[in-house]
Amino acid sequence: KILSGERRLKVIASSPSLDEVDIKGSADVYLKGTIKGVDLTLNITGSGDIEAENLQYTNLSAYIKGSGDIDVKNVKGTTVKTIVSGSGDVNIKGTAKWAALTVNGSGDISADKLAATEVIATVSGSGDISWYASKQLDAKVSGSGDIEYKGNPSILNKQGRKDSISRK
């Protein structure tokens, strides 16, 4: 159950379960309805976009190497991992126990409506990360980007420029 596209393509998928969505090029993929499973990887290499309505996965991974965007309107999961290495953006909402959010390029991760118990956020590029952490937050900025967070985590570890990590 893998979707893959390399040319200008628009795919609307409504499946009870998927393992991977892999876009190379400018394809657009819309995941309609509720899709459930254990592991789901969303991968964009190029300018394509992925939009998902409702994902219920134990482990959700989202990767962008290019200018494409990923928009997840609602996720329920244990682990959410996102890495942006290009100029694309990730917008993700929902709940997770643990989230690892990384920006290595100029793209942004907007996850301030993703309620996660523990969050690790790292910016080594010029992009920005915003998110919500309820218990533990580890934030590191080594590039020119910024990290903003919501919530009131009891454990807060910050590394980077003094003004680069702030509460929203």
Q: How does the language model describe each region?
A:
Residues K1-T45, E51-I64, V75-V80, K93-K97, ...:
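Acidic (Asp/Glu) and glycine-rich low-complexity loops/linkers
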Residues I70-K168:
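Short, surface-exposed interaction patches in beta-rich subdomains
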